[in-house]
């Protein structure tokens, strides 16, 4: 079981809600994934209508909702979005996202840290989306973040774990869960993240943009479980030279008789 804040999860696959062809397709993929934590951008909700055709079915499914502050350009906007989510959705959980550059969607480390500090002081359960920066992740942990969410590669790029070397350092040092977020484009990449010791992965585009999102969600669910089992089993050590599986000396002794 994975514990984040005051909640426990049996599934280590977290999912997003964007880019699906329809709400029905999203719900079917969500069910297939087995995910128990789903992130949703506050900017996508129709709060004036009093009913949202995306939010309502997600709540009915029983999964935990993780509102995110995607679209916020600075700490002030992100804090406002988080407070709005707590008031409207009744949750103090927030995925903190601040990316002022609309082209590359790179998270702003300074504004993210400043917002995280304020939100933690106000009683939020903060999961910040950040660069794979070990120092930043340690600092975010120190101000009270419940988990850290370093990127594997840019959002929606499907380029995989380009930051693998830094993710390994973050995982080694962290005292809170590490959720690899952004850029995971295939089940094998999700498995690789889990094999290196990530607590969980968050996947959206790779599922939603696939030809069959429901089948792809099943594939990701299996990959995450397998990757976690491999990590717990302990991967064999990597060597730079060949190491035979049979004793060579015994063979040469036999031939010389």
Curated annotation (Swiss-Prot):
It is an enzyme of class 2 (transferase). Its main location: cytoplasm. One of its GO terms (cellular component) is cytoplasm. GO terms for biological process: thiamine diphosphate biosynthetic process. 1-deoxy-D-xylulose 5-phosphate binds at residues 156, 182-183, 204-205. One of its GO terms (molecular function) is thiazole synthase activity. Belongs to the ThiG family. This is Thiazole synthase. It holds the Pfam family ThiG. The lineage of its organism: Bacteria, Pseudomonadati, Pseudomonadota, Gammaproteobacteria, Alteromonadales. The active site is at residue 95. It comes from Shewanella loihica (strain ATCC BAA-1088 / PV-4). It catalyses: [ThiS sulfur-carrier protein]-C-terminal-Gly-aminoethanethioate + 2-iminoacetate + 1-deoxy-D-xylulose 5-phosphate = [ThiS sulfur-carrier protein]-C-terminal Gly-Gly + 2-[(2R,5Z)-2-carboxy-4-methylthiazol-5(2H)-ylidene]ethyl phosphate + 2 H2O + H(+). Keywords: Cytoplasm, Schiff base, Thiamine biosynthesis, Transferase. Disulfide bonds: none annotated. Homotetramer. Forms heterodimers with either ThiH or ThiS. Pathway: Cofactor biosynthesis; thiamine diphosphate biosynthesis. Its EC number is 2.8.1.10. It is found in: Cytoplasm. It comes from the Bacteria. The keyword Heme does not apply. Catalyzes the rearrangement of 1-deoxy-D-xylulose 5-phosphate (DXP) to produce the thiazole phosphate moiety of thiamine. Sulfur is provided by the thiocarboxylate moiety of the carrier protein ThiS. In vitro, sulfur can be provided by H(2)S. Gene3D superfamilies: Aldolase class I. The keyword rRNA-binding does not apply.
């Amino acid at each position: 079981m994975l514990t984040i804040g005051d909640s426990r999860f049996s599934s280590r696959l977290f999912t997003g809600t964007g880019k699906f062809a329809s709400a029905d397709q999203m719900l079917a993929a969500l069910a297939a994934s087995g995910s128990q934590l789903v992130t949703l951008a506050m900017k996508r909700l129709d709060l004036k209508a009093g009913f949202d055709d995306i939010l309502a079915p997600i709540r009915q499914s029983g999964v935990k909702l993780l509102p995110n502050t995607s679209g916020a350009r600075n700490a002030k906007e992100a804090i406002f979005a988080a407070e709005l989510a707590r008031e409207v959705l009744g949750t103090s959980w927030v995925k903190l996202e601040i990316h002022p550059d609309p082209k590359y969607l790179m998270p702003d480390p300074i504004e993210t840290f400043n917002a995280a500090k304020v939100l933690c002081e106000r009683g939020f359960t903060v999961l910040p989306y950040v660069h794979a920066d070990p120092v930043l992740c340690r600092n975010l942990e120190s101000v009270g973040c419940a988990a850290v969410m370093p990127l594997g590669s840019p959002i929606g790029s499907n380029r995989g774990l380009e930051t693998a070397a830094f993710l390994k350092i973050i995982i080694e040092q962290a005292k809170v869960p590490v959720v690899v977020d952004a850029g995971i484009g295939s089940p094998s990449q999700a498995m690789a993240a889990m094999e290196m010791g990530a607590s969980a992965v968050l996947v959206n585009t790779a599922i939603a943009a696939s030809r069959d999102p429901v089948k792809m969600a099943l594939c990701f669910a299996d990959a995450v479980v397998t990757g976690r089992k491999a990590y717990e089993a302990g991967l064999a050590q990597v060597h730079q030279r060949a190491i035979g599986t049979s004793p060579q000396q015994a063979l040469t002794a036999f031939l010389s008789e």
